[in-house]
């Protein structure tokens, strides 16, 4: 029972991390490079992402896109083996609800890190050498700005575990989060302990991957 629930929760977390990494880093890079009106729009979106609770956002998404427009399923998670398209559609709303606040955090961290890197002396040297701005940003500045972003992603991954408890219950997804709530309500201590062990293992693995990513991105922090 726990293994099948773990697969569902990991699917939700991995999908959310992918969305947060792509959208959050992308918006942060755009905001640091362009500024102006675009920066204000992205700032507004980030404030909204931080201000809106994920359970409220989940209810609004279900009411709008599932109940009113019937675009996405309201509840549950379709098995990938039965329908890959249905599986993907059933992930969209819970991932959006879970990713809104982390996207805002990653975007702000990326923007600040990129702004600091783009003011560095080596960036002026690269510009003087004739490299295009796109090449400077994507190949050099982003890599140097990625270390603090990876740190934030590691912290957010741990906080996402708490978010899954709420989102899984809002969308009736059969994962570890909804199982934990049911077990607490039923005073089922062995199941609660099992869920806690799985969550602890996830945190340990996440920290391990963050350390590995640090070593890949910066040779200075590699353990000899």
Please place each PLM-identified region on the residue numbering.
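Alpha-helical transmembrane segments of integral membrane proteins
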Residues: 2-38, 82-224
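Membrane-water interface segments at transmembrane-helix boundaries in multipass membrane proteins
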Residues: 43-108
């Amino acid at each position: 029972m726990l293994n099948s629930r773990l697969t569902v929760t990991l699917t939700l977390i991995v999908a959310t991390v992918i969305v947060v990494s792509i959208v959050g880093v992308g918006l942060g890079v755009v905001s640091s490079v362009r500024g102006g009106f675009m920066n204000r729009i992205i700032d507004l979106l980030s404030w909204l992402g931080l201000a809106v609770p994920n359970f409220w956002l989940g209810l609004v998404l279900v009411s709008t896109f599932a109940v009113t427009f019937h675009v996405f399923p309201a509840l549950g998670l379709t098995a990938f083996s039965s329908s890959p398209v249905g599986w993907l559609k059933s992930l969209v709303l819970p991932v959006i609800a879970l990713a809104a606040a982390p996207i805002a955090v990653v975007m702000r961290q990326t923007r600040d890190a990129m702004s600091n890197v783009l003011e560095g002396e080596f960036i002026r040297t690269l510009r003087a050498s004739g490299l295009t701005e796109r090449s400077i940003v994507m190949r050099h500045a982003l890599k140097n700005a990625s270390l603090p972003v990876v740190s934030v992603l590691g912290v957010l991954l741990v906080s996402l575990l708490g978010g899954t408890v709420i989102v899984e219950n809002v969308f009736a997804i059969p994962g570890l989060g909804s199982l934990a709530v049911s077990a607490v309500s039923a005073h089922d201590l062995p199941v609660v302990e099992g869920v806690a062990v799985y969550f602890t293992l996830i945190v340990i693995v996440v920290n391990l991957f963050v350390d590995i990513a640090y070593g890949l991105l910066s040779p200075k922090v590699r353990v000899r």
